[in-house]
């Protein structure tokens, strides 16, 4: 069975973005994201794809979800729906969903794992991660709080579905 992991950095209010960008810069989170996703298919929505500074993400199979039938994402595969994107991952052990908010919302009921970077900030934004219902998710692992090289406190948390 395909393991489906949602990976995200979330502020205390579950904000993940503002104006199609992350409202903080935590180099250690980017390093974790890269290490975790290398060699795995990553699935994202069109807006997330368009926000990437480097496209496609190297060392990963990039799959972009867009309802626009003629949408072209150079260096990536496109899919019309989350279900179609997951079907492209049929031979993989794990698919990693990397956003944005709409895709996370669609994927949450299907997810087996959550890899959340808890960012100790409360920020204004326009994109939010879905609430993590503790009746469906148990905390499997948590790092101690750390302070990034940019001065922001954070922790990495791994949740498993009950």
UniProtKB/Swiss-Prot annotation:
GO biological process: dihydrofolate metabolic process; folic acid metabolic process; one-carbon metabolic process; tetrahydrofolate biosynthetic process
Enzyme kind, highest EC tier: oxidoreductase
GO CC entries: cytosol
Signal peptide: none
Protein name: Dihydrofolate reductase
Binding positions (substrate): 7-9, 29, 60, 117
Family: Belongs to the dihydrofolate reductase family.
Domain DHFR: 3-161
EC number(s) per entry: 1.5.1.3
Species lineage: Bacteria, Pseudomonadati, Pseudomonadota, Betaproteobacteria, Neisseriales
Pfam families referenced in this protein's UniProt entry, alphabetically: DHFR_1
Keywords recorded for this protein, A-Z: NADP, One-carbon metabolism, Oxidoreductase
Gene Ontology terms for molecular function: dihydrofolate reductase activity; NADP binding
Job of this protein: Key enzyme in folate metabolism. Catalyzes an essential reaction for de novo glycine and purine synthesis, and for DNA precursor synthesis.
